[in-house]
Curated annotation (Swiss-Prot):
Pfam family, one: HTH_WhiA
Keyword field: Cell cycle, Cell division, DNA-binding
Annotated SUPFAM superfamilies: Homing endonucleases (SSF55608)
GO MF assignments: DNA binding
GO biological process: cell division; regulation of sporulation
InterPro entries: Homing_endonucl (IPR027434), Sporu_reg_WhiA_N_dom (IPR018478), Sporulation_regulator_WhiA (IPR003802), Sporulation_regulator_WhiA_C (IPR023054), WhiA_LAGLIDADG_dom (IPR039518)
Kinase as UniProt keyword: no
DNA-binding interval(s): 272-303
Protein task: Involved in cell division and chromosome segregation.
UniProt name for this protein: Probable cell division protein WhiA
NCBIfam families xref list: DNA_bind_WhiA (TIGR00647)
Classification via HAMAP family: HTH_type_WhiA
Family affiliation: Belongs to the WhiA family.
Amino acid sequence: MSFTIKVKEEIIAASSKDIAELSALIKMSGSVGLTNQGLTLSISTENAKIARHIYQLIENRYRCNPELRHYNKTNLKKNRVYTVFVAENVNDILSDLQLADSFFGFETGIETSIMEDDDAGRSYLRGAFLATGTVRDPEKGRYQLEIFSVYQDHAEDLASLMKKFMLDAKVLQHKNGFVTYLQKAEDIMDFLIVIGAMTSKEIFEEVKIMRETRNDLNRANNAETANIARTISASMKTINNIIKIMDTVGLEILPVELRQIAQLRIANPDYSIQQIADSIEPPLTKSGVNHRLRKINKIADDL
């Protein structure tokens, strides 16, 4: 099950059944038809649980008898489309949800009453996400939450609604419409809180922390590996120079303080500068060890 579906099923289970949620679902996934008996309303989704949720919202609020239909786009089960079909009281439903103008082309944004009410705004965002929202699985890397709108003013109203909740929402033109999106992990987690998906928020946060911890460990390991490589490279250069001195003139020609360092380096090729410094009596500073190693290297270079 995708992370998007998990979020949607969680908010369905915790739905407040506010009419703003139903308004978003119908506005973004619905279409109006006309028969000899009057207007019909169809709301379509590829998720059976969302279809059942819409069915129950309409049935409970308007005391009508919707039909739940389905068909396959192809022979693949995952492409099954579910439609809640309403053939009675459609005018009353559209009027109650203030959607009549939306379906007849006069108003494609979000109702002012929803934009101005925080609770209604939360419910509308919940319905909008149920209708066309997606959120990238946090395990897969780059974070992204999107809600698709056919009309630009609706996408921009969604962004304004999100900004009321301190979310950094942006709008991008997309094929056949517009996308309102969030890209920051913190904004996505806050959005999940706004729409009531607390469990999904906690899962998202846990995955985010684990990914960041893994990345930090990888960076630390890479840095440590690089440091070890540099230490070994520098150590081998000095060891080769010490061997050159031994083979050419012998270590006995070195002053005592340099001979002591040379013998330690030959005996402990994997030691860091700090470890060499700590092994000398009395202990030296790292800069003191480096100074003596430079002298040894210069002597070898001059031979």
